[in-house]
Amino acid sequence: MSHRCVLAVVVLAFAAGWCMCDVGDFAPCLQFFYKSWPPKGLAGTPICQRHINQYVFATLYCRPRRSPWFSAYLYSAPAGKRPTASWKFEPQLAYPAADGNMIPFPPGPLDQNVVDSQAVEPDYINSTYSRGHLNPSLHHKSHENRSATFTLTNVVPQKSGSNDGPWEDLEQTVNRTLGAYCLGEAFVVTGSIPYQNDKHWLHNHRVAVPEYMWSAYCCPNYTDNLPEKLKDAFPTFAAIGRNDRNSTEEIVPVDKTAKKQFRGYDVKRMPLETLEMYLKDRFSTVVSVFYEQCSGSD
């Protein structure tokens, strides 16, 4: 789609008053949260991520940081090859009355409202950070759903030493574990943790860089014959990963024997309660990821 066509879609949608309320309310996509209960304690702009007229996952977006606090989704075992990246943006962040389907970035200049409202591709060009998925394509079955994860509203600046190393290993581990032992729906929430001083940004205060990434899943219905090493991985599992090799080791220690390119980007697995303790400490408020900590009670 040309730059002119993208502008026409956005402007016509605004003029016509189309609004599916995909931005500003999680109500249309509560199915991606355990017990229809979004995480509590974090403030931001809810996005029901819609691709080809289907809701695929949910994101809590921080407009001032131009990056997500978390993305929430239902795990499904992947099929086929990883899609070729076709990066997209959220039109309703720029124009609230626009159509809610994510749109591929056009070649050439972008509408300034889009640039002002969210991260755009030039933010990552010539930076030392990769585009780190919160909701990874690996955790989805259909090609369409996997393709939908390639939106910059689902991405944080992530060091390649993390993205291509320990964090990728975590995503693969979660994929194998849920695929083999989760018998029902598996709800996953993956998010970012800011620096305490919040002074790390891309391109002159355009996009905030997180110090850590975190992830947790809730699978209330799982097999009875779990391997001994996985008995503490159900019904919940959580982890925090380093995104700065120079961060202190209070939260995640460093394995000094790791390969040089991955050293300092360790991932620490922990109980859900421990993750929420670290989130409370960094965000200075109680953060609850799952309803009743995925206890299954009503």
Describe each PLM feature range.
Residues 19-70:
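Signal-peptide-cleavage-adjacent N-terminal segments of secreted and extracellular proteins
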Residues 7, 21-23, 31, 50, ...:
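Residue-level detector of bioactive/disordered segments in secreted/extracellular proteins
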Residues 2-21:
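Cleavable N-terminal signal peptides of Sec/SRP-targeted secreted and luminal proteins
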Residues 51-130:
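Short, His- and charge-rich active-site/binding loops that engage polyanionic ligands
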Residues 109-298:
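Domain-level detector of nuclease and nuclease-like folds
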Residues 5, 63, 76, 138, ...:
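Residues that form ligand- and interface-recognition hot spots within folded domains
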Residues 17-19, 27, 46, 157, ...:
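Extracellular secreted precursors and ectodomains with disulfide-bonded cysteine-rich loops/domains
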